[in-house]
């Protein structure tokens, strides 16, 4: 067979699922007639349309391209509309073609014609398929078969019997594309069919060639050799096409393939939709029936006889047992498979037992149906309580914190609830309340996160002190607005030489206002609940002195929370409060005094000292005399420190 090439992609686009191959070949041949030729995107769009149209296959029995074109959305991308128009024109032109005149017999030739000169070539009758237009409008040229071409053709006809419509449409398309010679057709037959089918085809072809040579073929010269030899000449296009037509006609006498299932074995499933069952029948008949065999009577008969009982009852009730296929599809279109009926197995109910329950000691029920829980076999291994299992031990459940009062809930800086307390390092078992962050001594805790309660009946106004760096600080009443992107200040707060820039502000109603200016000078705003001022690099200036608004740029630096209480009360600013219980990490470190050399006599415990020397020393105190008392001051012990820190007490 020559050099073997690797298997490549199929040169013929594959049809969508559910569409017969010979119908798909009609779409392909119509697409090849377009100028410029179709692209892969056009075939993708065509497949998408056909997949949607196959859900209502009424346009296929018989096939109606005009009805399919009406289902196409307006302005659909690709050349799908052009392909359908070609099919519609061809479908209307096929019945109007006159029958070709019978070929003239050699006995009716004029007496003055020279038998050595062949008669002029007459174009043979085109097959009942769409012609394929090759690139640039040139006629097809002969191309020898390649292994990848033969493999692609065999893959297309692998499920079809020789002589079936799908088989013949694929072979016709391949013949029109490659324009093969007699030798090429013989190679194709040996590659596609078995030896028995090839032998039967050869016998049928010989009889057709003998009949054609006797009848007379346009362009055939008996002195130049048999028709098979003259068809191998690439220059004899007319004779080669005649031979190709005879080669295709010889498939009509071939038997069907024995591997195809019988038509009677294709049955509708219990839950299979009716149109899917009819489509399976249609594809099976296309793949197995010889070309020219009427398919509609067989399809109508099998569509009723092989349907399930429910669809047969619907068709009988509407009188569509042998109606056109479109009426049968409409009759069963609304049918849906019923759910499988569940058979309930009725079991006799056992009488209640007379014996007492092993769990509660009462009669009338079994222990598995007892309402009393099963007692544990022993005490709980965690708390030694014999009344519950280990999985129900209270120690395994997290402690539910008590709800905080309403006032405490407003203080957002209170310690967070964590499951485990914080242990201090060598702190004698002391614990510290968990906090969100460490409060520094030099930082005011009231400036961290304020909660501002507002009255719903009043506007959220607040007094603020504004310092514009060009004039003295002034106190104004500003509006808190979380919907304003920038802070707005009246122009009266700025001096006359303040540089201002023109800008436009888009209001909430969509109107643009131009009486606002933009300043790039830093502005300091002091709020009553914040000790450090807010620094704004720029803000809007109202030239009409109507608005003083604190926007999101200032509120974001405060990190404040606006709170709307339920009860009406005057607005109160709640500052941040420190926790009521402070841990040792919040206190300053105790003083450390060097104790070396250590006085063993002075480091005795205080309870061993007598009061008499102290009274005598205090009563006989002389000016400038210092009495030193050593008291034990406990401090957190450091690693490796076993001494006691003592501090002098000056009286």
Swiss-Prot record:
A motif (PTAP/PSAP motif) lies at residues 124-127. Keywords: Aspartyl protease, Capsid protein, Eukaryotic host gene expression shutoff by virus, Eukaryotic host translation shutoff by virus, Host gene expression shutoff by virus, Host-virus interaction, Hydrolase, Lipoprotein, Metal-binding, Myristate, Phosphoprotein, Protease, Repeat, Viral nucleoprotein, Virion, Zinc, Zinc-finger. A motif (PPXY motif) lies at residues 118-121. GO terms for molecular function: aspartic-type endopeptidase activity; nucleic acid binding; structural molecule activity; zinc ion binding. The modification Phosphoserine is found at residue 105. The record marks 130-131, 344-345, 449-450, 574-575, 582-583 as: Cleavage. The active site is at 481 (for protease activity). The keyword Methyltransferase does not apply. PROSITE patterns: ASP_PROT_RETROV (PS50175), ASP_PROTEASE (PS00141), ZF_CCHC (PS50158). The keyword Lipoprotein applies. Its EC number is 3.4.23.-. One of its GO terms (cellular component) is viral nucleocapsid. GO terms for biological process: proteolysis; symbiont-mediated suppression of host gene expression; viral translational frameshifting. A lipid is attached at residue 2 (N-myristoyl glycine). Coiled coil: none annotated. Residues 641-651 have a biased composition (Polar residues). Residues 476-554 form the Peptidase A2 domain. HTLV-1 lineages are divided in four clades, A (Cosmopolitan), B (Central African group), C (Melanesian group) and D (New Central African group). This is Gag-Pro polyprotein. It comes from Human T-cell leukemia virus 1 (isolate Melanesia mel5 subtype C) (HTLV-1).
